[in-house]
Amino acid sequence: MDKILNLGRWIFPLSFLLYVGLHLGKPEVGASFVPVFLPFPLFWNYLTAALILAFIISAVSARYDKLAYALMALYVCLMALLVHLPRALSDMHGAGMMTAAAAKEQELEMINVFRNIMLAGALLAFARFVAKDRRIIG
């Protein structure tokens, strides 16, 4: 059973490859999530892909993995607060008039908020109980 449970150390960080693929495969979609107050949305999309890839490499290689898990937790919390929550709470068409598609989009954004909060918890748990390299943040 321990051998199966130990697979989580690999499966969890490698699952983030999906996000790298989404950022690189459909950059215009990733760029559409960049808040309007940030210039150059495609730059932020590609930078995000590179940083997620750096997280994966760090987590899998167990080099600076505690720091990587903690920083990734910070990133997903910031995404929840700065991207998904404002989109979930926005009145897209003003005066309470909302199409079914807009209501569905807001619902999905709220699901993204909850998903990011759960993911941040998992990342922090991995930083505390799974990470091996404690050079930077003990």
Per-region residue spans from a language model:
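Membrane-interface helix-loop junction between the first two transmembrane segments
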Residues: 25-37
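Extended, low-polarity transmembrane helix blocks
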Residues: 1-28, 42-54, 60-138
